[in-house]
Amino acid sequence: MSTETLTLIKNSIKSIPDYPKAGIMFRDVTSLMEDPKAYQATIQSLVEKYKQGGFTKIVGTEARGFLFGAPLALELGVGFVPVRKPGKLPRPTIAQTYDLEYGTDTLEIHTDAIVEGDKVLVVDDLLATGGTIEATVKLIRQLGGEVEHAAFVINLPEIGGETRLEGLGLNVYSICEFAGH
């Protein structure tokens, strides 16, 4: 990816101070999607990175993972699988609970969405703690999928999610990084 493309993408992401609470600098990818050139450059950079990966499925985690994972899946000519919060998927599912800063949350995937031997790429908008993606990876592996790669638009390296995911055997890629929380 060229420096010009990276600058376009990074500059299109708005930073919102003290959201959702004081001391947090929220990185808003919806502003990136409002700019068609930046959005297209983001998807194309992921296509270039993963077009030779041999993936059979792209999995996106609710909700912003859908916005990058689905167009990537179309470009790669593979299926897209959403991982959602409980009660949002109509067919039989399996669930994985994970820890949040204050409490827990749960994610679900259709039991027939991943088959034994599927080579899966996980996509989300932002990597912070890695908890959501860890739960997603556990769901995929429980269904027999092979997942060794996770891609993000943004990484917040100071929070430690990349190290956490590498501990699960994942190769982690992010288009850009921002300092802080």
Curated annotation (Swiss-Prot):
Localization, UniProt: Cytoplasm
Cytoplasm is among the record's keywords: yes
Annotated keywords: Cytoplasm, Glycosyltransferase, Purine salvage, Transferase
This protein's pathway: Purine metabolism; AMP biosynthesis via salvage pathway; AMP from adenine: step 1/1
Its EC number(s): 2.4.2.7
Catalyses which reaction(s): AMP + diphosphate = 5-phospho-alpha-D-ribose 1-diphosphate + adenine
Coiled coil: none
PROSITE patterns per record: PUR_PYR_PR_TRANSFER
EC primary class: transferase
Pfam families hit by this protein: Pribosyltran (PF00156)
Record GO cellular component, one term: cytoplasm
TM annotation in the entry: none
Source taxon at top rank: Bacteria
GO BP annotations, alphabetical order: adenine salvage; AMP salvage; purine ribonucleoside salvage
GO molecular-function terms, A-Z: adenine binding; adenine phosphoribosyltransferase activity; AMP binding
CDD domains: PRTases_typeI (cd06223)
Its job: Catalyzes a salvage reaction resulting in the formation of AMP, that is energically less costly than de novo synthesis.
Assembly and binders: Homodimer.
Recorded family membership: Belongs to the purine/pyrimidine phosphoribosyltransferase family.
Protein name as annotated: Adenine phosphoribosyltransferase
Source organism of this protein record: Aliivibrio fischeri (strain ATCC 700601 / ES114) (Vibrio fischeri)
Taxonomic path: Bacteria, Pseudomonadati, Pseudomonadota, Gammaproteobacteria, Vibrionales
